[in-house]
Amino acid sequence: MSSKAASFVRFTVQEGKLEEVVAALKDKAPGYRSLPGVLSLTFAQTGAQEIRSCAVYDSMASLETNGPALKETLASVISLLAEGGFERAVGEVVVEA
């Protein structure tokens, strides 16, 4: 099994705010991606008002250490999300191709 960890976030965006959220994520993502232990960061639009992200870290410790930086990175989009529009799951990477 890998020692890498991944974080998956589902963002449900308020009606009419999708472009603003995408712009904010594009602005903030490079800074977060450059943090120690962050191996990759991807965002995809998965619905009319939904974006999902996947961040892969070199370890669960790196995922946990970068938690405050993730909160800071996402602070600019939280007000643009629908009520209950942020759902996060984390886990250990078990298959990598």
Range-by-range predicted roles:
Residues M1-A6, R10-T12, V38-R52, A75-A97:
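Glycine-rich beta-strand-turn "strand-cap" elements at beta-sheet edges
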Residues D27-L39, V56-A89:
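An amphipathic, aromatic/His-enriched active-site/gating alpha helix that lines ligand/cofactor pockets
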Residues T12-A23:
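Short, surface-exposed ligand-recognition loops at beta-strand->loop->(often short) alpha-helix junctions
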Residues E19-V21, S53, L63-T65:
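Short acidic, gly/pro-rich beta-turn/loop elements at beta-sheet edges
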Residues A6, L25-K26:
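A generic structural signal for ordered secondary structure
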Residues E15, A48-I51, S59-L63:
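Short, charged/polar surface micro-motifs in flexible loops or helix N-caps
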